[in-house]
A protein has these predicted regions:
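GT-A fold catalytic core of metal-dependent nucleotide-sugar glycosyltransferases
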Residues: 116, 121-178
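Non-transmembrane, aqueous-exposed alpha-helical and coiled segments at domain scale
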Residues: 126, 182-186, 243
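Short, aromatic/basic amphipathic alpha-helical patches
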Residues: 62-76, 94-96, 247
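Short, acidic, metal-binding catalytic loop of nucleotide-sugar glycosyltransferases
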Residues: 39-51
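Short beta-strand-to-loop element that shapes/binds the nucleotide-sugar donor at the catalytic cleft/hinge
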Residues: 177-191
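Catalytic core and acceptor-binding pocket of nucleotide-sugar-dependent glycosyltransferases
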Residues: 149-151, 155, 187, 194-275
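N-proximal low-complexity "stem/linker" segments adjacent to membrane-targeting elements
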Residues: 1-35
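Active-site-proximal specificity loops/subdomain of glycosyltransferases
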Residues: 74-134
Length: 275
């Protein structure tokens, strides 16, 4: 489904486009479906013409997602792609029994996260890669955003401009073969050669992106690192630890963004940085 905007009559020189990639699967997690419904509406109804979005979801949610997309009146473009969890390439590479083992060692399972959460989190780069392969919008830059990352209600911005209406600005997404990602907590000196990160968070995996070369490089590094975690029987259900391994061993491909806590939730600071 596409909700395509009209071409502007005062376009100047052509420039590239950014495809925003996200996914939603109604699985047991820390938050219930009604909470996600609010967050999904917060995001999809506030993005404008700059936003060309690809949304992966389960077959039973395609109609719901298309209905939300149709309510956007700011000129954003959407493509909803049906894909069952059992079709994930991640499961072809790492069978379900490996994720059952991962759940048994999860230090935070009590918060409500599940095997399905692990599969979705560790498939983010596979979703982006699939969107790049289809290249629906002819983009040379791609960014990932968690579907539940726009948590402030729309009316909270009623007295100021809607920052998301211009999200993402092409020129604000890195074009130097680096991946933009938020650094939540600096790495200690002794962590710079660390291979396995456990139950620590340094990077926000909720949002990241860059040009296609940067994404391809991160894709390669991420799944090599995930191999190390899983083959070593180390917990890797949460993608943020695997991203840390990639970062400390390949710092040259990351553009680490220091968030300003005055600009909202630091986990989702790239909404501000890219707008």
């Amino acid at each position: 489904m596409s909700n395509m905007s009209n071409m502007s009559n005062n376009e100047t020189e052509p420039k590239g486009t950014v495809t925003v990639v996200t996914a939603y699967y109604c699985v047991k997690s820390k938050h219930d479906p009604s909470q996600y419904d609010m967050w999904i509406n917060n995001l999809l109804l506030r993005v404008g013409q700059n936003c060309k979005m690809v949304i992966f979801t389960s077959p039973d949610l395609v109609e719901y997602m298309n209905a939300v997309c149709k309510k956007n009146d700011l000129g954003a473009s959407f493509t909803v792609i049906s894909m069952e969890i059992k079709e994930f390439k991640l499961l072809k590479r790492y069978p379900l029994k490996m994720w059952v083992q991962q759940y048994a060692m999860d230090p935070q399972k009590s918060c409500g996260r599940t095997i399905e959460c692990y599969l979705i989190w560790n498939s983010k780069l596979m979703f982006v890669k699939e969107a790049m392969k289809r290249n629906i919008y002819g983009s040379d830059k791609y960014v990932w955003v968690d579907i539940g990352s726009c948590r402030a209600p729309g009316d909270s911005m009623s007295n100021e401009s809607n920052e998301l209406e211009h999200f993402p600005r092409y020129e604000n997404v890195s074009n130097d073969d680096k991946v933009d990602i938020v650094l939540l907590r600096p790495y200690a000196a002794e962590e710079m050669n660390q291979v396995i990160f456990y139950n620590t968070v340094h990077l926000s995996g909720a949002m990241f992106g860059g040009n296609t070369r940067a994404i391809n490089r991160l894709y390669e590094l991420f799944y090599k690192a995930l191999d190390v975690y899983l083959c070593g029987n180390c917990f890797a259900g949460c993608d943020q630890q695997v991203l840390s391994t990639c970062c400390v061993h390949n710092p040259e491909i990351f553009n680490l963004i220091i968030p300003d806590s005055k600009k909202g939730d630091v986990w989702f600071y790239l909404y501000h940085h890219w707008s």
